[in-house]
Amino acid sequence: MKQAVHFGAGNIGRGFIAPILQANDYEVIFVDVNTDLIKQINEERQYKVTSLNIDGATEEKINDVKAIDLGDTEILNETLLNASLITTSVGPKFVESIYERVATLDNQKDQIFIAFENMYKASSSASSSINSRNKNLKIIDAVVDKIVPPQPPTSL
């Protein structure tokens, strides 16, 4: 199975990006700074996403997820080297530092970096100011405009 590392285990990451990644056969590994959330994700390994549409509410179960603390450098770097897709939903001001971390790894395999942020060309903006050693890192721009209301704490 392909591996995706997603920075940001908040509402957009868990409620929007992870379901799309899993629907496309990616194993999802979240990276976050919230140690309680990281612990909960790693203990439960699953959560539910409730979506509302014109026909009412639908519930989707997201399975087999993991999380890594941003400060756990050794495990994070090893995980990043194995990932084929690296994504973010952390807020535009943090994308450049994440891109720099990925771009300075000496990776020999093809990887894709997508910043799913509420900012035009967030991926390109981050990559334009960083000299990448990773020549196999491809940049894709995306803009996210989806409202994910706060989820109850019991739903992870």
Per-region residue spans from a language model:
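Substrate/ligand-engaging "lid" and interaction regions
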Residues: K2-V5, N11-L156
